[in-house]
Regions:
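Primarily the dimerization/phosphotransfer
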Residues: 1-40, 61, 199
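Short conserved segment of the HATPase_c
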Residues: 31, 173-185
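Alpha-helical segment immediately C-terminal to the catalytic phospho-histidine in histidine kinases
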Residues: 40, 44-64, 92
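Helix-loop junction within the histidine kinase core
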Residues: 74-85
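Conserved catalytic submotifs in the C-terminal HATPase_c
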Residues: 84-89, 110-120
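Short helix-loop "hinge" at the ATP-lid/N-box region of the Bergerat-fold HATPase_c
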Residues: 140-141
């Protein structure tokens, strides 16, 4: 059995390295190709030059994101991922996330925040929470062309859980793919740029924080990604503010 496990592990590592090499080559090829065109073609129109430069910049950002994600995976696998816990006012946190992403979401998409009237406090790693939800928001933005994107949270006082969610009216995810999207390097759409690592990393972070991620989606109607996080029952008394 041990030999079989080692063989499976070796196969997974080989597959990971092959995928990683492919994902790194793709933006590098674009950077090198368009850079060579800018150098070799003296009579390119200014508009075309600007397009090439923009493409190079986009692929540089993608490559940097890929490298950061790979480093994050390395920290996860070596057990060196660090967490710093503090008290988080969820209403203030949603406000901050809303302000940041309202600049990034296209104006034709309505960006909505949904929070309870009374602020609710939890003990968590705020940066890691933001990392998870930023991933959800980025994916919603990629796959939503009209309608809305919602960011918010709900409290279930009967189960002592907080549901922090991103909901969209995007293209939706086929049922058979809803588990696969959390696998490394999996992309729902090969024509949409991304590292294919974000949801895999988010899943691990969610588990390290003591929570879990779920997805509900319907083709043509949209998706809802939820981070479900337990809280201590004394939060109702100590951490709620009217």
């Amino acid at each position: 059995m041990r030999a079989k496990d080692l063989a499976i592990e070796a196969e997974l590592k080989q597959s990971f390295l092959a995928n990683m090499s492919h994902e790194i080559r793709t933006p590098l090829n674009a950077i090198v190709g368009f850079s060579n065109l800018l150098v070799s073609e003296d009579d390119l129109p200014d508009e075309e030059k600007a397009d090439f430069i923009n493409t190079i910049n986009t692929n540089c950002e993608l490559l940097l994101k890929l490298i950061n994600d790979i480093l994050e995976l390395s920290r996860i696998e070596s057990g060196n991922m660090t967490f710093s816990y503090s008290t988080c006012n969820l209403n203030n946190w949603v406000d901050s996330m809303y302000m940041t992403h309202s600049l990034l979401i296209p104006k034709e998409i309505e960006f909505i925040k949904e929070v309870p009237d009374a602020a609710f406090f939890i003990n968590t790693d705020v940066n890691r929470l933001s990392q998870i939800m930023t991933n959800f928001l980025n994916n919603a933005t990629k796959f939503t062309k009209s309608g809305y994107i919602k960011l918010g949270y709900e409290i279930d006082f009967s189960t002592y859980e907080v549901s922090i969610y991103v909901e969209d009216t995007g293209k939706g995810i086929p049922k058979e793919e809803q588990r696969m999207i959390f696998e490394r390097f999996y992309k729902q759409d090969e024509f949409v740029q991304g590292t294919g690592l974000g949801l895999s990393i988010s899943m691990v972070i969610a588990e390290k924080l003591g929570g879990k991620i779920s997805v509900a989606s319907e083709i043509g109607k949209g998706s809802r990604f939820t981070f479900l996080l337990p809280y201590h029952n004394e939060s109702e008394e100590v951490f709620s503010a009217g």
